[in-house]
From Swiss-Prot:
E.C. no: 3.1.3.11
Assembly information from the UniProt record: Homotetramer.
Cofactor(s) required, per the database record: Mg(2+)
Name the UniProt record assigns to this protein: Fructose-1,6-bisphosphatase class 1
Gene3D superfamilies with a match to the protein in the record: 3.40.190.80, Fructose-1,6-Bisphosphatase, subunit A, domain 1
Species per Swiss-Prot/TrEMBL record: Pasteurella multocida (strain Pm70)
Amino acid sequence: MKTLGQFIVEKQAEYPNAKGELSGILSSIRLVAKVIHRDINKAGLTNNIIGTSGAENVQGETQMKLDLFAHNTMKQALISREEVAGFASEEEENFVAFDTERGRNAKYVILTDPLDGSSNIDVNVAVGTIFSIYRRVSPIGTPVTLADFMQPGNRQVAAGYIVYGSSTMLVYTTGNGVNGFTYDPSLGVFCLSHENIQIPANGKIYSINEGQYLKFPQGVKKYIKYCQEEDKATHRPYTSRYIGSLVSDFHRNMLKGGIYIYPSATNYPNGKLRLLYEGNPMAFLAEQAGGMASDGYQRILDIQPTELHQRVPLFLGSKEMVEKAQDFMKTFG
């Protein structure tokens, strides 16, 4: 069976001018996945990573101990790479410039949600790590600037996630399809288990927090009712499945077919998920697997960011389902 390391080397060989920089970054992320996997598997045995840290992130959300552990693990792994010029995280207010000679001469910046769904960790529900990689736009040889991180998602060079569930999987794209690798803890390696993943064009699963129904826009309410109606021709009603972890919900829907929705609401008028740390990387993966990602009106990957922690409504998954939901939004608002 092909390992992630072998796969990365093979793909690099397809580009004669490649210098292995992106491969090196992916290797560091592979190491991060192993470290976080190890500590998540001990979550019930120690209090060091379970519970709240007593601090809040820039969005005013309570940070879990494991949020900070995952954030620091990712940050330290990337600082050691000569290919990375800077780093931005959902857990940190400002971006971090790796202002060393190596960092100033590096070509790439990384954005990450270090631990998606971390509030689920103490009840043993799957969580994940999301990452996004861009080529910097500021001059090589200088420290990175905010502009390096404020690029639309269509300029990503790679994106992916790690899901820590019944098994740990690393799923990523470099713009040439989506591949998934399952961690074998007995060997300490990720093995290619899901090659060239394709999202079914349609599905029977919709994933949304229906407890917030009264706060949703009319278009979302109408779409939920559409999903619940009985219609044999379109195989409705659909099944509602919502874990509360973007990575876990999207991973299931990508393999089985479905739509994930985190819309705007009266308490989150701009949506709750972050464009740069969650929306863009998941949208890149969805499109590379044949799916679609929208804010209800436009393509996620075409949105020009205006803030580092900008929020966005997210409709993500099977192409036909996202198109239908978008039709409801455009009709009913």
